[in-house]
Regions:
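Peripheral, non-catalytic segments flanking oxidoreductase cores
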Residues: 1-214
Length: 214
């Protein structure tokens, strides 16, 4: 188990190739990627911070709805062949035997998926004012941050020019998840009833934004 007082921190502005601290920051990215294997991106722009605030507001509006609310039920993924939409509490797979995931989620993918490949299902959006627009805007912003991060990793490990970016540019398998971990009664909290158990993701990288520690 990795124990850190705080994660390595990378200045997002210094990942721009014309920044004064670019070479030094690339070495910091390499070191963090090797050990512990993750890092925290700092110094996001005011525009990105504003988009995050709007996203948080939309998430609060959606996840505050009851599980029997028509807005949620209309896009419920339970017993559906479409994984895009609202996943109710305890539907998340148990990634470790004997655990129960204490969360609900809203999942969606890129529009081009269902247009270019019929095997992909279309997105389903909750009927909440500006929800779709605000959430898509934050995903576009995070996509730009992701590509910048891929460029940094590419440079750090001396891959062929834009190798990582070129292998991630279609985003066919890219998915954004809005996750809600409701506060649990202290009597229910134990090693088996977890927010989400330890697991690995299948993407090249995963960007995580949290509203609280944990």
């Amino acid at each position: 188990m990795i124990e850190l007082k705080e994660p390595p921190k990378i200045d997002l502005e210094q990942l721009q190739k014309d920044s004064s601290g670019y070479k030094k920051t690339i070495q910091e990215v390499k070191q963090a990627a090797l050990n512990p294997g993750f890092f925290c991106l700092e110094n996001i722009s005011e525009e990105q911070a504003d988009l995050f605030a709007k996203t948080k507001k939309q998430m609060d509006a959606f996840f505050s709805l009851g599980s029997d609310d028509p807005i949620k039920l209309d896009i419920d993924t339970t017993d559906s062949d479409n994984s895009y939409g609202w996943m109710p509490m305890f539907q998340e797979p148990a990634y470790e035997a004997g655990t129960l995931a204490h969360l609900e989620s809203f999942d969606f993918g890129r529009r081009k998926k269902s247009v270019e490949k019929p095997s992909y299902k279309p997105n389903r959006w909750p009927k909440i004012k500006s929800f779709r627009e605000d959430i898509r805007n934050i995903w576009d912003a995070y996509t730009n941050i992701g590509m910048l991060t891929l460029d940094a990793l590419n440079e750090a490990f001396i891959f062929p020019n834009e190798f990582l970016k070129n292998n991630c540019d279609t985003q066919d398998l890219s998915t954004m998840r809005l996750l809600n971990y409701p506060k649990a009664d202290s009597s229910l909290i134990n090693k088996n009833n977890v927010g989400i158990s330890a697991h690995t993701d299948f993407e090249c990288i995963t960007l995580i934004s949290q509203t609280s520690p944990g």
